[in-house]
């Protein structure tokens, strides 16, 4: 039977318990005797106390069934309660939380536990004065009832037993079962068992035979209780971090410690436990955190309204000053947290943001909800008007104290926590706030100028957390859930604000921001004179400092919180108004430091990250609703100057252009506006095509133009494009260009054009080497097709062989001659002047051709450049040209490209294939210098040539280019191009057949060709 009892525990758990147990009892008497008394089921006669240092010793234990005869039915496998353990445990935990929340702080007797006023009333009543905190057997069946007076159950034990089962002698078996589970659950606290075990063992061992629960279970249960009592109380006094966390959640989550301070018995136990068996802060913290975690995530019941919130204030006056901060936090917590629900808060608030994405919010909604607990007390106080007023008075009185030295954040939290129950708490808060405000103001002055014009719409609440603004440590996601380590600060920040934000104080707050703002503007680091108002503003602002949005966003009920935080205007107070009621503050104080970071973290392309807009724009709309005075007060301190009404005081800080809330946004707007204003100027389409506008602006014009030309349709813009690429010639020929400008209304000034040309040439030279040749090749790259030739004749965009016009080859020859003559003769201005195509606006492309020709014709550096001649030849339809040099250069260039294997010959093109489309498809393999589509007049078939800049790209296109065709198109036949296809009608290349035959016959392209394509290829080779 006893085996069943201990069978619930793992061997290692049992062994560790015994080791701890022995360690605790070494000073109290024979370990063997006590063990035997506590665990009658074990026959320890075989073992020495020295044997217990080994974890394996328990394997030798013999279980004595005769010792457990008294409780045969306790462990009966038929006990139906065994199957209810899981559900009971859950109910037990929930009931524990609920009951403890309802316990008055002055009365910790059984009267507080309705379930215990029955059979255990006597033992519990005697529990308070009992000198020993060691809980005895939970429910004695035998007449050993008086024994509980000395060997009393711990408060938590009784609660555990009472909540799950009504305590009575008939329910002892159930209690035993529950205790077994409690023992199992308490193994996480096992390290601390040692500290309390001595007290537990002080209880008389006479009842061990008759107890319904083994001492092991009792001990484990009591250990948990004691651990909580000590772990929660001392931390309030000693650990700066614990108080914050406990105040915020343990107040409700682990209420057991709360009654403890008020209960003499608990205080005795605490006093005894600390000196006798000190528990490390880490253990207590771990315990508290575990309990709080369990309650926070598992027990929504804890948020039910407390049944006895009134008694809580008693704790504040309770003589046990050791937990001085605790009573206040409890009062706060229970008043607010019992009803607090994140979901309820979110639903209740008019949240303008997407709550599901806390990282998108300037201040996480979760963090901002905590302040709800702050407002709650004000609400309670509002119910009793005396309280809010007192709070305000305290704040006002505290304002002079703001000069006090500013303690470190954590100690600061502690101090405030302790005094939170008293108005002094507000004073300390305000002191801290003002001290931080002074530091913040200095930082703000600098930061505001730096960040004042970054995205005002987005602020980060936590930038101020550890004075780490400068290091940009402000995390965007500051919710207790995501950042539990910050929980204490968050909660604390929320709570202090409550008194400072009574709605009654709202008018004063509104006025206060003005005075405060004025001082802010002056930059006085110590705003103590405006202090009282500022105190009201700043007192909450330390908390706001931590979760600035909390007061503004979470406290939807209280507009004052909004104005309060904005006046402080600290860059860390990044308040986003999540509700229409809080817009004033929300808009005004935004952290500019993180605006760019926020924008960038979501995505560096604002067009693709609309989520920043709601937080950025919505907060501004509500501002209009607020009174002008408030807006002015808030706007003055706000570095962003987000307020629509810029007051003269803050004018120097406020950017006048409200719509442009960030540098990036303004930059983009300027970039987009520029093309509109430039309509008819150089590159109006630069912002409409290619990469993002803000990326394009920074790129060299040559690169941009190449990209744009692919998608740009002829609309007369080409007239404006030519000056860019013609820079070299334009430099030499200012007059010619001026004439051209007369034709091109709105052409950019000469200086700007030259500057762009220099940039283009520099980038091209750096990448390709020889300036003019590279420039021409770059410029002509996109002019290979007839469409390109007609539309972008002037652009000369990176196509070294634009001479191959898809138009009539004879016409090309004539154009070549004309262009060559013109260029060689160097009659640029005359040509452009008398060129018949220059005047008609309808033929803008031809005008450009002539102008380009004229401007470049006289340029000595271009007289020898074949690319230039070809380009102009293609573009020009004018009368003057000399073709011999261009033919010569074109032939050399083609021969060079073919010899390097950079020319790809594509046959079997669809009838609707254009050079532009062909180039667009094959650009995936690499940069294309030239692309043209030609038609065989005899058969009407289309074929094309693509000249890549790199031979590797050409080889890649040969192997994979066949896959670029559409389903309704015939298969492409690709091969290395021969000279024959580039020859003018009067020129014959006798080697082209042999050069072309080799690739055509032995290339892998045939592997990708279907039968029809192969047949056509064979037929073509025969002709």
Curated annotation (Swiss-Prot):
Modified residues (Phosphoserine): 384, 524, 638
An MF annotation (GO) of this entry: AF-2 domain binding
Residue ranges of the motif LXXLL motif 2: 343-347
Induction: Repressed by saturated fatty acids such as palmitate and stearate in skeletal muscle cells. Induced by insulin and reduced by aging in skeletal muscle biopsies. Down-regulated in type 2 diabetes mellitus subjects as well as in pre-diabetics.
CDD domains: RRM_PPARGC1B (cd12356)
Bias-annotated ranges (Acidic residues): 429-450, 806-825
Motif placement: HCFC1-binding-motif (HBM): 691-694
Keywords associated with the record: Activator, Nucleus, Phosphoprotein, Repeat, RNA-binding, Transcription, Transcription regulation
Biased composition (Pro residues): 132-146
Cysteine disulfide partners in this protein: none
Subcellular location: Nucleus
Main subcellular location of this protein, as a coarse class: nucleus
Low complexity compositional bias, start-end: 793-805, 849-866
Stated role: Plays a role of stimulator of transcription factors and nuclear receptors activities. Activates transcriptional activity of estrogen receptor alpha, nuclear respiratory factor 1 (NRF1) and glucocorticoid receptor in the presence of glucocorticoids. May play a role in constitutive non-adrenergic-mediated mitochondrial biogenesis as suggested by increased basal oxygen consumption and mitochondrial number when overexpressed. May be involved in fat oxidation and non-oxidative glucose metabolism and in the regulation of energy expenditure.
Comment, domains: Contains 2 Leu-Xaa-Xaa-Leu-Leu (LXXLL) motif, which are usually required for the association with nuclear receptors.
Listed name of the protein: Peroxisome proliferator-activated receptor gamma coactivator 1-beta
């Amino acid at each position: 039977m006893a085996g069943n009892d201990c069978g619930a525990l793992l061997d290692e758990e049992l062994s560790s318990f015994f080791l701890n147990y022995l360690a605790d009892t070494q000073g109290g008497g024979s370990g063997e005797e006590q063990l035997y008394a506590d665990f009658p089921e074990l026959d320890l006669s075989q073992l020495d106390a020295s044997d217990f240092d080994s974890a394996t010793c328990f394997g030798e234990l013999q279980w004595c069934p005769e010792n457990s005869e008294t409780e045969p039915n306790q462990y009966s496998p038929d006990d139906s309660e065994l199957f209810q353990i899981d559900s009971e445990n859950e109910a037990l935990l929930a009931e524990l939380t609920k009951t403890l929340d309802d316990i008055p702080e002055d009365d910790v007797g059984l009267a507080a536990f309705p379930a215990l006023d029955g059979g255990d009333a006597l033992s519990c009543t005697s529990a308070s004065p009992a000198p020993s905190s060691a809980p005895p057997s939970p429910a004695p069946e035998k007449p050993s009832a008086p024994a509980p007076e000395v060997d009393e159950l711990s408060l938590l034990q009784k609660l555990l037993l009472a909540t799950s089962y009504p305590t009575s002698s008939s329910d002892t078996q159930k209690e035993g079962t529950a205790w077994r589970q409690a023992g199992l659950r308490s193994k996480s606290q096992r390290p601390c068992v040692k500290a309390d075990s001595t007290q537990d063992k002080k209880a008389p061992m006479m009842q061990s035979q008759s107890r319904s629960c083994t001492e092991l279970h009792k001990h484990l249960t009591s250990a948990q209780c004691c651990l909580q009592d000590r772990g929660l109380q001392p931390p309030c006094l000693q650990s700066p971090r614990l108080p914050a966390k406990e105040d915020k959640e343990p107040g409700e989550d682990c209420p057991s410690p709360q009654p403890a301070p008020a209960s003499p018995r608990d205080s005795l136990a605490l006093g005894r436990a600390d000196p006798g068996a000190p528990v490390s802060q880490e253990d207590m913290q771990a315990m508290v955190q575990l309990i709080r975690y369990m309650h926070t995530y598992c027990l929504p019941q804890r948020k039910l309204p407390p049944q006895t919130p009134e008694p809580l204030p008693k704790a504040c006056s309770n003589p046990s000053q050791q937990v001085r901060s605790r009573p206040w936090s409890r009062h706060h917590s229970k008043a607010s947290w019992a009803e607090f629900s994140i979901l309820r808060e979110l639903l209740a608030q008019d949240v303008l943001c997407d709550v599901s994405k806390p990282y998108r919010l300037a201040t996480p909604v979760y963090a901002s909800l905590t302040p709800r607990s702050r407002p709650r007390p004000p609400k309670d106080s509002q119910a009793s008007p005396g309280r809010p007023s007192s709070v305000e008075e305290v704040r006002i009185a505290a304002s002079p104290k703001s000069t006090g030295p500013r303690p470190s954040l954590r100690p600061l939290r502690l101090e405030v926590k302790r005094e939170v129950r008293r108005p002094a708490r507000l004073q300390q808060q305000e002191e801290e706030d003002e001290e931080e405000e002074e530091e913040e103001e200095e930082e703000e002055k600098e930061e505001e100028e730096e960040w004042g014009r970054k995205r005002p719409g987005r602020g980060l609440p936590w930038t101020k957390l550890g004075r780490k603004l400068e290091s940009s440590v402000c995390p965007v996601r500051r919710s207790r859930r995501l950042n539990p380590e910050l929980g204490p600060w968050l909660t604390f920040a929320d709570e202090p604000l409550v008194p400072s934000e009574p709605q009654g104080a709202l008018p004063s707050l509104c006025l206060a921001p003005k005075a405060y703002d004025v001082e802010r503007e002056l930059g006085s680091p110590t705003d103590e004179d405006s202090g009282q108002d500022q105190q009201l503003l700043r007192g909450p602002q330390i908390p706001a400092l931590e979760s600035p949005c909390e007061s503004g966003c979470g406290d939807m009920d209280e507009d004052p919180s909004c104005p309060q935080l904005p006046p402080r205007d600290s860059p860390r107070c990044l308040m986003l108004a999540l509700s229409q009621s809080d817009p004033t503050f929300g808009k005004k104080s935004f952290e500019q430091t993180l605006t760019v970071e926020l924008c960038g973290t979501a995505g560096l392309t604002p067009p693709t990250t609309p989520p920043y807009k709601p937080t950025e724009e919505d907060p501004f709309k509500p501002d209009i609703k607020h009174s002008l005075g408030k807006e002015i007060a808030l706007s003055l301190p706000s570095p962003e100057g987000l307020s629509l009404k810029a007051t003269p005081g803050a004018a120097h800080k406020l950017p006048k252009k409200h719509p442009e809330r960030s540098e990036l946004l303004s930059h983009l707007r300027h970039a987009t506006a520029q093309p509109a204003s430039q309509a008819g100027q150089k590159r109006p389409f630069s912002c409409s095509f290619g990469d993002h506008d803000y990326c394009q602006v920074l790129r060299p014009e040559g690169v941009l133009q190449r990209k744009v030309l692919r998608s740009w349709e002829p609309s007369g813009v080409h007239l404006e494009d030519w000056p860019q690429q013609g820079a070299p010639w334009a430099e030499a020929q200012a007059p010619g260009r001026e004439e051209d400008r007369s034709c091109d209304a709105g052409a950019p000034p000469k200086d700007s054009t030259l500057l762009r040309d220099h940039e283009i040439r520099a980038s091209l030279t750096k990448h390709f080497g020889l300036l003019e040749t590279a420039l021409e090749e770059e410029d002509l790259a996109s002019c290979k097709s007839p469409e390109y030739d007609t539309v972008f004749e002037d652009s000369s965009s990176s196509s070294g062989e634009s001479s191959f016009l898809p138009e009539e080859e004879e016409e090309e020859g004539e154009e070549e001659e004309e262009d060559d003559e013109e260029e060689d003769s160097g009659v640029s201005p005359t040509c452009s002047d008398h060129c018949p195509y220059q005047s008609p606006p309808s033929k803008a492309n031809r005008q450009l051709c002539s102008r380009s020709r004229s401007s470049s014709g006289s340029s000595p550096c271009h007289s020898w450049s074949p690319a230039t001649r070809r380009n102009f030849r293609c573009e020009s339809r004018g009368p003057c040209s000399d073709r011999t040099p261009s033919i010569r250069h074109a032939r050399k260039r083609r021969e060079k490209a073919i010899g390097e294997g950079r020319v790809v010959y594509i046959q079997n093109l669809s009838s609707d294939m254009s050079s532009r489309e062909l180039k667009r498809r094959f650009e995936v393999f690499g940069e294309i210098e030239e692309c043209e589509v030609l038609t065989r007049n005899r058969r009407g078939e289309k074929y094309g040539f693509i000249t890549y800049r790199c031979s590797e790209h050409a080889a890649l296109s040969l192997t994979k280019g066949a896959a670029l065709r559409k389903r309704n198109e015939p298969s492409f036949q690709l091969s290395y191009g021969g000279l024959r296809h580039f020859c003018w009608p009067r020129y014959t290349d006798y080697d082209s057949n042999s050069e072309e035959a080799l690739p055509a016959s032995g290339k892998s392209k045939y592997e990708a060709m279907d039968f029809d394509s192969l047949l056509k290829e064979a037929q073509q080779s025969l002709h």
